[in-house]
């Protein structure tokens, strides 16, 4: 029986393009790819070839393990001072009656609805509301921790934090320290979109730039917090913009080691200012996941956000470098459903997630936010699994 590396070596021998052969052997030998080589993967690599290489790297890092967690989302508001072209979610302050604004009491009601349930994480992100200030969110963090100290709070993109800090006249260091002391445990990856100014200027010119986003994550890492990172793909960007974005993330990861997971996010074109742009194909989606796994050699995990992709496509990514399927979600997010995502009421029971992972030939492992193993579900009977 051939080993995984033997199988990939055999596949490489069928590649006629010398530039791809060189890249393939670098990957087999664990060598870092250059930016130009990342672009070459996108432009020239066949899907089967990319998938085999990405799966080789994935299995070298994680074997058959596929992680998931039990989590829920709170979205405090969709009222937002910014006007991103790709966003189907936000409403301007002048039209806030069309959106929602949750009080701390309402958000605590959501938290308390999970009392006695085995969730390990609450994920809090939303629009940038001009009246929801730093003190409001510090009080929210303190309230959650006082009620349920064991619940990991992953909250606030750099877009939200940058606005909070500037309004409160705080430095990034001061603001992050205050949030951390109030109960913030880690940062999600949102708000990154595309770092390259050529694209960022066209799709989200008025919010925090790439340097600001990276500075907030760097500061979080320096405080001992971990975070995730995202990239919004499939709109007006070119392949070199994607690689530039991943290169900046890779450099910060070399510096701090604080990123856990990279999450490619597919652009959806429903009800936004970019609805004239066709969405990417399944083939392009899988290409994005595979190249992400190959280029981001220092990121431990690549995640498929199943509410955005849909269950079956997310399952397919497990053959293209992905080793994390996110969480149960429990129909608690509207950010992508309002943009036309595959899952309009995103919720999966733990048993459904376990079965989805098993049917792809992978080993389902429930994790905490920081990838501590909560439970191995490889041999657990589905009917015995709690929702």
Enumerate the predicted regions with their spans:
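Conserved strand-turn element in the central/C-terminal portion of the radical SAM core barrel
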Residues: 122-132, 153-164, 191-197, 204-205, ...
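Canonical radical SAM enzyme core domain
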Residues: 95-109, 129-180, 192-193, 208-212, ...
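Conserved, mostly hydrophobic/aromatic
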Residues: 30, 54, 84, 124, ...
């Amino acid at each position: 029986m051939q080993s995984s590396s033997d199988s990939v070596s055999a596949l490489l021998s069928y590649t006629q393009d010398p530039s791809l052969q060189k890249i393939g052997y670098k990957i087999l030998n664990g060598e870092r790819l250059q930016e130009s080589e990342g672009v070459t993967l996108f432009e020239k690599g066949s899907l089967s070839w990319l998938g085999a290489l990405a799966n080789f790297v994935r299995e070298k890092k994680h074997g058959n393990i596929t992680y998931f967690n039990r989590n829920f989302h709170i979205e405090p508001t969709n009222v937002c001072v910014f006007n991103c072209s790709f966003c189907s979610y936000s409403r301007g302050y002048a039209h806030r009656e069309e959106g929602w604004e949750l009080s701390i009491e309402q958000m605590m009601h959501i938290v308390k609805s999970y009392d006695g349930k085995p969730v390990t994480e609450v994920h809090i992100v939303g629009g940038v509301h001009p009246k929801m200030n730093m003190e409001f969110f510090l009080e929210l963090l303190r309230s959650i921790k006082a009620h349920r100290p064991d619940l990991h709070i992953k909250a606030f993109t750099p877009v939200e934090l940058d606005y909070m800090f500037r309004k409160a006249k705080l430095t990034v260091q001061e603001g992050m320290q205050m949030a951390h002391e109030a109960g913030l445990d880690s940062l999600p990856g949102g708000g990154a979109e595309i770092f390259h100014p050529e694209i960022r200027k066209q799709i989200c010119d008025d919010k925090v730039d790439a340097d600001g986003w990276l500075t907030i994550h760097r500061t979080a890492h320096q405080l001992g917090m971990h975070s995730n990172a995202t990239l919004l793909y499939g709109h007006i960007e070119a392949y070199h913009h994607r690689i530039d974005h991943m290169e900046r993330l890779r450099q910060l990861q070399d510096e701090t080691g604080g990123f856990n997971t990279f999450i490619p996010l597919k652009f959806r074109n429903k009800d936004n200012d970019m609805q004239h742009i066709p969405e990417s194909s399944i083939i392009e989606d899988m290409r994005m996941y595979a190249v992400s796994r190959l280029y981001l050699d220092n990121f431990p995990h690549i995640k498929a956000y199943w509410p955005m992709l849909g269950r079956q496509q997310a399952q397919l990514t497990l053959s293209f470098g992905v080793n994390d399927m996110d969480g149960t979600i429990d129909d608690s997010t509207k950010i992508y459903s309002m943009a036309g995502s595959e899952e309009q009421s995103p919720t999966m029971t733990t048993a459904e997630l376990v079965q989805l992972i098993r049917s792809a030939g992978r080993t389902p492992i429930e994790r905490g936010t920081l990838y501590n193993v909560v439970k191995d579900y490889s041999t657990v009977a589905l009917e015995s699994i709690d929702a």
